[in-house]
Every structure is written in structure tokens, then in C-alpha cells.
């Protein structure tokens, strides 16, 4: 798999490059798995190995110690990963009580710590009990391990060292517990309630800005391409309620509400909201089957405000620093301390199906944001006035600039006409 991106100053291809990267990932996998269904218990076990080759070529300008400096490296890593697993399951009490127990082992050759699969030992247990034909209780608990990205493993510093290997990069681990119940009276109704708690350890934290990589998104470019330490923690917990009406007089209705928190520690061990910590999500969906192959459906969503960060005014008003990104810099000391307003949106869709002997034709009209709701977004900053001129700071016009705020709302209606053919 190949990834890449090039950015030019002022988006002018005749100008000098600000950043240029290209990465290639190649994998060869071998896996063995065996199932036994005739034993007193169901047994599944297996093992696998994976050879990976990762190559990354990076060039970018950086603002460091008040100066714009180029940064460039080439990396190539060969990695052997391995896995073994076993899972046993059975049913008791006239199949009302179901139990599943499993263990997973993973490792790779990047660091001494990651090469020992015992350190990534991952047991998990699943229980389910049917109190009656219409009431079930479920519970899951487990420990999981996930390797860091190739980008993070392949990062090299200015001296050409794989610093994250020297920093003792580790598998990201997670302890998860989920408890839920489901009540389904009759043929049409279904209600469920679920609570969850997820605790993360060894999450990579950036040594440059001191925040967890878990909170870095596409706004940050190639995520993980930096020096990190596997010292971050995280937690996500909440509850979800779902109610469904299915197949009643050709009507389907679903209502779900999720109340949750998602937080990761920074370099000082302080929990900060993750970038997707909207805290609550409400979804209402409905569909109705009309005569002659017509269907109409709708979905209404209400989402809590996402967190965002104020800008680093000192760095953002520096002309040299601005020339690299052409946008404001994040104030990582106050990371995700602000929050957008809540948002809501209605999507509607109309389908018409035509059935033929060996295939089906589906025509549809989909309208997103049907009532043109203004979706709040974090402020955008510009260094230009309304006439397009750079706003020099009168106190230091050669090196400093002024900024103004553009309030942006993504409140556009988006209609789509489509055709689907199924054989």
C-alpha cells in the first residue's frame, strides 16, 4: 500500500515544497486455524506470522527555535510479527447460559519488549444468560494489545536514529468491560441497555507537543511521524440505550442514545478530552415500505459539541512560522479546552426498486442536511484583510502579523441521485 502527499508554498506548484512524503507498506501473511465442533466443548485455535516491509521518505519544513529549518529522512524497516490464539466455548442449563473463554498472544521484532508475547498476553471472557425467551443478559471482559503504526516505528531523527525504538516503544494495551441486557417482547419490539468501560495503557505521547497520538487527526498530516514515548493512558466509558420497532406494518423505527466520555493523558498525566469526545449522540431513524417497490427513509442526528483548542498566538503571528503551514498553530498547553456548540442534521432518502429475472435495479434520491442546519466548526484564522492583503503588525512589520477570525459553518444541503444494480 502506498501513501503520499506534497504541499507547496501558497499551493503554487512552481514554488518551493513545504512538505513531501511517500510511504510504502508490503505484507506477507501465513495463518493456520483449526476448529473442533465434535468435542465436549467447541474449540478454536491457530497461529500466524506476518512479514512486513515499510519504507518512508519524508521532507518537510519545521519551525524550531525561531527559525525555519528543513527536516528530511529515509527509513526502511523489516518486521516479523507473530500470533497464537485459542478459544473455547460451551452452553449450559438447556443452552440458556453461554460461556466463551479465549487467550491471544502477539509480538513482533521491533523492540525487545514487543518481541516477548507474554507481555502482550490477552485473555478475554464472554458470558450470556437467557432469563426467558425475551430477556437476555450479556457481559464481556478482556485485555487487548495493538501494535503502534508503521509510521511511528519508522520515524528517524536528524541523526538517522530510529528514536522510538530507543525510547522503548510498546504495544498499546486496553482493558475492556461491557455489560448489557436485551428485552424483546413479541415479534416487533426490541430494547437494549449497555454500559462499557475501556482503559488504555502505553499510548504513544508526542515528545514535541506533549499530547496523545490518539487525539491527533488528519489536521496534523502524517500522524505518528515523530518522536514519542509509550507513557500515555486513556479511558472511555458510557452507556447506550436502543429501542427498535422492526417490520410492524412495513415500518421500521430505531432510536438510540449514547452518553459517554473519551479522554487521554498528556505529557503531565492530565486527562484531556479526545478529539471525538462529543459526550452524547442521539440517532432517530425510520423507514417505510410503500407499494410498488417504493421506500422512504429518514435519519435525524443530534451530536454534542466536539472539543477544540485555542491557538498559540505567539507562534501563529510569527510570519516565518505561518509560512510553513499557512494556518494558525495549536496551543497544546490548552489542548481541547474549548468546545463547539451541539449540532443536528436530518437526512432523507427515497428509493425505487425494479425487479427483473436475474437482477434488480435501484434508483434513489438522497438528501443530506435536508433543512440546512448550520453545523458549527472551529474558528479559522487568516493573516489577510478583506482585500487579500497581509496584515502586518505595526510593532514589528517585518517579522510579525495580525490575525482575524473567520467563523465557518458547514450548513450545505447535499442532494445525491444514484443507481444501484444487483445480480
Language-model regions, residue ranges each:
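Gram-negative outer-membrane beta-barrel transporters
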Residues: 92-93, 197-199, 220-310
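Structural signature of Gram-negative outer-membrane beta-barrels, strongest in the C-terminal barrel
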Residues: 40, 74-201, 256, 281, ...
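Face-selective signature of the C-terminal outer-membrane beta-barrel domain
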Residues: 1-114, 130, 189-192, 254
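Transmembrane beta-barrel strands of outer-membrane/channel proteins
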Residues: 1-3, 45-51, 101-107, 139-143, ...
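C-terminal beta-signal and adjacent terminal beta-strands/loops
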Residues: 301-325, 341-345, 352-423
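Surface-exposed extracellular loop regions of Gram-negative outer-membrane beta-barrel proteins
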Residues: 60-62, 129, 134-177, 197-222, ...
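Outer-membrane beta-barrel channels and translocator barrels
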Residues: 37-41, 92-95, 130-134, 174, ...
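Outer membrane beta-barrel strand-and-loop segments of large Gram-negative receptors
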Residues: 19-35, 72-73, 77-85, 166, ...
Amino acid at each position: 500500500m502506498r501513501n503520499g502527499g506534497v504541499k507547496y508554498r501558497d499551493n503554487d506548484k512552481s514554488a518551493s515544497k513545504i512538505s513531501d512524503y511517500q510511504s510504502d507498506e508490503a505484507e506477507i501473511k501465513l495463518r493456520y486455524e483449526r476448529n473442533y465442533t465434535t468435542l465436549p466443548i467447541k474449540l478454536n485455535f491457530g497461529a500466524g506470522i506476518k512479514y512486513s516491509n515499510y519504507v518512508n521518505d519524508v521532507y518537510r519544513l519545521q519551525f524550531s527555535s525561531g527559525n525555519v529549518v528543513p527536516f528530511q529522512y529515509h527509513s526502511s524497516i523489516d518486521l516479523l510479527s507473530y500470533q497464537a490464539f485459542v478459544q473455547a466455548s460451551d452452553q449450559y442449563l438447556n443452552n440458556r447460559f453461554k460461556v466463551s473463554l479465549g487467550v491471544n498472544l502477539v509480538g513482533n521484532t521491533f523492540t525487545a519488549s514487543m518481541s516477548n508475547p507474554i507481555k502482550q498476553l490477552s485473555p478475554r471472557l464472554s458470558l450470556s444468560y437467557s432469563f426467558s425467551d425475551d430477556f437476555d443478559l450479556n457481559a464481556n471482559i478482556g485485555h487487548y494489545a495493538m501494535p503502534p503504526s508503521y509510521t511511528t516505528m519508522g520515524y528517524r531523527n536528524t541523526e538517522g536514529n530510529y528514536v522510538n525504538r530507543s525510547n522503548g516503544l510498546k504495544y498499546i494495551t486496553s482493558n475492556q468491560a461491557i455489560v448489557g441486557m436485551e428485552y424483546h417482547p413479541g415479534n416487533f419490539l426490541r430494547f437494549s441497555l449497555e454500559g462499557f468501560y475501556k482503559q488504555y495503557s502505553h499510548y504513544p505521547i508526542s515528545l514535541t507537543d506533549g499530547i496523545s497520538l490518539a487525539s491527533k487527526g488528519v489536521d496534523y498530516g502524517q500522524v505518528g511521524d515523530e518522536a514519542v514515548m509509550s507513557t500515555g493512558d486513556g479511558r472511555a466509558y458510557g452507556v447506550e440505550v436502543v429501542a427498535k420497532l422492526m417490520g410492524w406494518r412495513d415500518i421500521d423505527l430505531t432510536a438510540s442514545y449514547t452518553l459517554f466520555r473519551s479522554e487521554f493523558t498528556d505529557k503531565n498525566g492530565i486527562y484531556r478530552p479526545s478529539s471525538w469526545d462529543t459526550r452524547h449522540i442521539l440517532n432517530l431513524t425510520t423507514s417505510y415500505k410503500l407499494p410498488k417497490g417504493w421506500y422512504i427513509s429518514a435519519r435525524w442526528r443530534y451530536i454534542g459539541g466536539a472539543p477544540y483548542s485555542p491557538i498559540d498566538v505567539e507562534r501563529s503571528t510569527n510570519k516565518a512560522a505561518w509560512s510553513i503551514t499557512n494556518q494558525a498553530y495549536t496551543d497544546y498547553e490548552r489542548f481541547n479546552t474549548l468546545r463547539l456548540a451541539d449540532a443536528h442534521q436530518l437526512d432523507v432518502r427515497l428509493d425505487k426498486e425494479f425487479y427483473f429475472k436475474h437482477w434488480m435495479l435501484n434508483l434513489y434520491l438522497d438528501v443530506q442536511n435536508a433543512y440546512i442546519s448550520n453545523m458549527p466548526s472551529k474558528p479559522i484564522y487568516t493573516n489577510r484583510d478583506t482585500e487579500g492583503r497581509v496584515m502586518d503588525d505595526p510593532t514589528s512589520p517585518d517579522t510579525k502579523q495580525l490575525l482575524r477570525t473567520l467563523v465557518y459553518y458547514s450548513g450545505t444541503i447535499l442532494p445525491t441521485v444514484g443507481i444501484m444494480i444487483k445480480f
